[in-house]
Amino acid sequence: RRGDVMLLINGMPVIHIELKRSKVDVSQATFQIKRYTHEGVFGNGIFKMVQIFVAMTPEETLYFANPGKEENFKPEFYFHWEDFNNTVIRDWRRIVSDLLSIPMAHQLIGYYTIADDKDKTLKVLRSYQYFAASKISDITHKTNWDTHQHRGGYVWHTTGSGKTMTSFKSAQLIANSGDADKVVFLLDRIELSVQSLDEYRGFAGEDEAIQDTQNTAILLSKLKSTDNDDRLIVT
């Protein structure tokens, strides 16, 4: 079998695009990708490096992270790409220019995917998560912190919208950019703190440490520490 379009970054196949003609339901493209997985196309050799799947018709596009196994294909993790105001982009030309362009395609792969160690799956951010994390990181970078006139901000989330992943990715971007010495996840309930700590550690890379604080003394020591492993703190 032969796929339709493969995007390469530095010679490596990372985004597979499956196309269907106009008026054909986009689900046929996702089914085709799932069939390729069943046949082992993405399980061996160089195509095992594919990170993102894109199912596209001229009128509709879905994108999702490579789930690895056929049984892990779940439609609830197929996402439409939306603009900053959460309006679904349907025209394929906008998808190409907004999502599959350079440098956006590079950023999606490099910064806005998460290899979740808990369930051993790759996750990609929804568009609104991308815009939130990107905006927070950008404002943090551009702010003059010497003025002492900076204001706080918030991201409005509903239940099940992925706030844990959004907060982690925002913190990760800020910490890795060097724009902050410390990033603190402040939770208002012990149960939520334990749950979030577990999820954050699943999201973190091999070279990233998420620090827990059992009491005020430990929190103070982590805040004073200059160790890179103490940059991300949950309390």
PLM-predicted stretches and their roles:
Residues 206-214:
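Conserved AMP-binding/adenylation subdomain of ANL enzymes
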Residues 216-233:
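Conserved motor-coupling elements within RecA-like helicase/translocase cores
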Residues 1-182, 191, 195-207, 227-231:
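ATP-dependent helicase/translocase motor core
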